[in-house]
Structures are given as C-alpha cells and as structure tokens.
C-alpha cells in the first residue's frame, strides 16, 4: 500500500491510513445499501447464521475489509491481542496491568513527561462492526468458530511470519465446556480429558494462537476473573446493593458485572490490590516468550 505525496514522491502507507480508506468505502457501502433497499435494511451490521464461512454474507469490498481487519488484529498485530468473553474483562485486565506496571514492563509503559501509562497489549473490544466483519461478539461459542478458521485465514498472510501472539482468555467455569471439548478433538497435542486441560497454565493451538484459562481455585474449583479480586472488593456496596456476578441476579438487591467494573473496579483502581491477577499476567508473559522461541526475529 503506497501513497503519493504532494511533491509526487511515493511512500509506504500505514495500517491506520489503509484502515481509514476501508472505513470510508464501507461508509459509502452502508449508505448505498440502505438507500437501494428503501430502508428495508436499516441496520447495516446484521449478522446471519453462516457458520464458519461467515464471509458468504459479505460483498467483494467487505471481504477485502474483513481480510484487512483480520490481519491487523490477529496476524500483523503490533501488540499481543487478548480476546476475552465479556466487556467487563478488559476493564479488569487494564486496571490490573496499570496497577502492577512496575512488575510488568513488558505489558505497559509509563510516559516520562505525563506519567500516563500506555498498555503494550491490545485488549480486543467487540462492537457491531467487528461482529459483522470478523464474526466476533465475545464468548466461548464465538471463539470455537474463531480457532477453527484461524489457521485457514492466516494462510493468506503466511509469506511473512505473525508478529505477536493472539490469546483467547476464558473463565475456567462451565461456559467454555464445548470450547474445551472442541480443542481436545482438533488438537492432538492437548490433554485428552477436559479436567486436565483446565489445569494447564496455557496452550499453544497453532501459528500464533493460544488459549489461557483463569487458574482453578483451591480444590480444583471453577473460577472466573472476578474471583481474583480480594473479598473486600467483592463485598463493596453500590447504591446500597451487593455485587452478584451471576447473569440472573436480582437487580432490586444486587448489581451485576457492568456496574462492578465501572463503579467498583475502575473508580477504585488506585487503591485496589490486584496482586491476585499476577498468575494470569505471568502466563501472558510466558506466552510471549513461547511465541518468540517459535518465531525468532530475523
């Protein structure tokens, strides 16, 4: 991808500049789709069930945009990309990494002048556009399709090695049961029993793709990211209500993950002790080391 400057000289374009071009073309596509169909399709990013071959729903321009977005996030990614199950997980991780920045210079840097901290990892956040172009909205079911097509999609870029790992971070509870069964089936180098898979720190699946589960609790009990906050944090009140991490909590007496992430974790991040997150962050560092050994710089 090259650009012509005002003086007529050519230069290599950046990924951000190329993404801007794609976004502009897609904006026109979106407008034309609505106009052509007389508003019969007012929502541009409608997702239909095409299974693994989700690109069937895309036109040629959209397929090119999808291919670019996949490369940018999952093959030519300039930083480690971390995929999580829910929209609250990136909040937890960002706050934990920021709080523990002295222990994890590989994951965050502090700007000298402003003292602002900038993450060195990409905590992938889903939205309607990514759902449409990448078939990702978060959750173990999405990632079951993701890992099954990852190797095939990466073949389009294999003339150059991947730049960084892509990590699927999942709660170690009942949610990813089908995901675990599928990776056992598809990757012969993994343990053959689900309970053994759950005990591992992390697994390399293929190419630059890894899976990382939250560590099991004592007694090999299931865990989720919320379990790595101290009890006193989990017991903090919001508007007189208690935190309940279940999806079916009683909103009249309790509050859920969204408010916990926003009003408890984010607002108290400077005083919360995030040290229980260290095993997870340590595994991310180990994954990076493993990746470098597989793909040493030339």
Where are these regions (language model features)?
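Acidic, divalent-metal-binding catalytic cores of TOPRIM
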Residues: 1-298
